[in-house]
Amino acid sequence: MNLRPIARSLLMAAGLCVPGLQAGAGAPAIKRPVVVELYTSQGCSSCLPADALLAKLTKRPDVLPLSLSVTYWDMLGWKDTLASENNTRRQKAYAATMGHGAVYTPQMIVDGTTDVVGSREGQVLSAIDARARDGDTDFVPVAVHETKDELHIGVGASQDRGAVPATVWLFHIKGQATVAIGGGENDGRTMTYHNVVGDLRAVGQWKGDPLTIDLPRAGLEGLPHDSVAVVVQRGGYGHVVGAAMLPHPDFAPER
């Protein structure tokens, strides 16, 4: 399938706490970004180095970093202003898929396959490098752009005809959010978070053949974001085979 022309898009084919967007422009078109998800919390003091590392990763054109704040540390006395149950459920789904007995923060999940303590920069960077090499063998082209009435998502064909079906995820991202924290382990700090996931949803299933998904813009307006990202992921929470980001679509709220 020939995808429609891409307008204003990036086409990229290509201690712990344990409880009881900016993807840069200019990446080569034959590559895709490595998706890095940070599970974090405003109530977790151990998360601060991981939050800082994620901010650094937003400067890399070969990485699509996402910050997902979870809810389970709200019990420490500060309700995380960026957290959502969707984020918490996603992390728990990863834990079940990976066979982990518990969730924790800060956790970075690299391309849906590798679980790394988010504050261990060397391990995180090594995991990114490994997926950048391995991902060249199984990537699927993904494009996202907007038209007058729709958000258009295009997913290309797989070379592996026996590939496991994949979920197409849509992430709504706020590039930066500054928060004055008034309780919990980080009481008194003012933190700036980057590539904050304000909403996420599954918008389709990809089974190896070219796929087009058109979402009405009317249903996207007013959501807490200034960018959107599309991630194509084996099963629901398996390895990532494609991703793309659309910064500052017209339907995003005024910044």
Protein language model regions, located:
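Bacterial N-terminal signal peptides that target proteins for export
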Residues: 1-11
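Bacterial N-terminal signal peptides
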Residues: 9-19
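Short N-terminal helix-initiation segments at or just after the protein's N-terminus
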Residues: 14, 49-55, 171-177
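Active-site-proximal cofactor/substrate-binding loop regions of enzyme domains
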Residues: 24-104
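Short, conserved sequence motifs used for protein processing/export or organelle targeting and
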Residues: 79-101, 114, 118-255
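Conserved residues at the C-terminal ends of beta-strands
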Residues: 111
